[in-house]
Amino acid sequence: MMASRLTVGITTRNRPGALATCLASLAGIRHLVGEVVVFDDGSEPPADGKGDARLIRDPSSPGYIVGRNRLVREATTDLVLLLDDDTRVIDASAIERAVEVISGDDRVGAIAFAQAEADGRPWPVTLQPSRAARPSVIPSFIGFAHLLRRELFLRLGGYREEFIYYGEEKDFCLRLLDAGYRTVYLPDALVGHVPDAAGRSRSRYLRYVVRNDCLNAFYNDPLPRVLWTLPARFLLYFRMRHGWRIHDPWGWLWIARDVLAYAGRTRDRRRPVSRASIRLWVELKKAPRPYA
């Protein structure tokens, strides 16, 4: 039995069935878990934490990014496993291995898991955090399931809550990389992900992905890089909208207004990472580094 204890934090909104399945799946890692905390993002009717889970409810529905920050702050353990409500632990050894890696190497700031069907079949490699076939250092995890160091996460400021939905992982992992830490991907550490359609909107997803990529560039990219990365990321909206066949003719205007508004109000929060960190991020995206 492993000595390390962790907090499992789950964000949920209007998915009672998925949440119940996720909570039930934690039975296999009971020996690792010190506590389970659920953030209810304004579900109607309110979510039921069930069992020993501690429930935190915010009826204002501020978004899952705010929820994740709250979960990490509320955690009472050094390690925090954050899960979406439509995930499920299908292999206890995946979580055990992740805890072993992050506990054994002070340079590791986060662990990325591989996405799988409920029966354990891995998702296509194009939908994974990386194409790497062995444990590797990569730029970023995917937020559906990830393991963090609580103290480090809070020291770096956590997720930017103005992102609201989507893209917060890349922004955080870039700051983590700039602070000298690494994100390690374990391709054999599978976590079930059974996306629930409740509350999903393709046009909202597109808007927030592009908006937050623009804000990521604004906050983190050094000069002169930001002068071309910010407009380039904005223009991706049109390519993505066409490629995904999403009818959202005025989404670009919403994005432009929102980015300009946030840039004007929060320009004092701009903290560009080093050029060396940008180079390393690009290198890891092209060629993940094997992690031994």
Can you say where each PLM-predicted feature lies in the sequence?
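N-proximal low-complexity "stem/linker" segments adjacent to membrane-targeting elements
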Residues: 1-25
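A conserved acidic beta->alpha catalytic loop
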Residues: 25, 38-48, 88
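Glycine-rich, basic loop-to-helix element that forms the pyrophosphate-binding segment
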Residues: 58-75
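Short aromatic/hydrophobic "clamp" motif used to bind/position activated sugar donors
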Residues: 80
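Conserved donor NDP-sugar-binding/catalytic core segment of glycosyltransferases
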Residues: 88-123
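A short, conserved alpha-helix in the catalytic core of glycosyltransferases
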Residues: 145-148, 152-157, 162-190
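Non-catalytic, C-terminal membrane-associated alpha-helical segments of glycosyltransferases
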Residues: 225-292
